[in-house]
Curated annotation (Swiss-Prot):
Its main location: nucleus. Residues 123-143 are annotated as: Disordered. One of its GO terms (biological process) is regulation of transcription by RNA polymerase II. Component of the Mediator complex. This is Mediator of RNA polymerase II transcription subunit 10. The keyword Plastid does not apply. Signal peptide: none annotated. It holds the Pfam family Med10. GO terms for molecular function: transcription coregulator activity. Keywords: Activator, Nucleus, Transcription, Transcription regulation.
Amino acid sequence: MAEAARQELENQLRQTIETLVEISLLVHDTTGSQENKEGLIEQMDTLVKEFQRLKEIKCDKQIPIDVIDYIDQGRNPDVYTREFVELLLKQNQFIHGKMDIYTVSKGVRESTSDDIPLDISCGAHSNTEISTNPGQKRQGNVS
């Protein structure tokens, strides 16, 4: 049923666009004659009826306001879609990179957990013995 409503909406939109084109041609080529005025009034009535039919069509599709703004500015909505998809791809790559770094760092932490003690005390020690040779000891000041 949703497909039928979408098709009906598309057909009605096409008819409305055709009526708008006919109105623009009538306005552009107007001679000011009574016949021309009556034709324009008739097309305007048709346009109003087509807008009413558009309003009556039930369609559960929501159009983002950004897309409507694009159309109002005379831009192609496909450009909006392409730019939106490119932005999502960049964000996805960024998040994927963060996840990869976390996985690698977690692996490094796990592989070095035996080598590095968890409780490392830091501080200044005076007169700490520093060994330069395994058999020789000397006094040094580490700060």
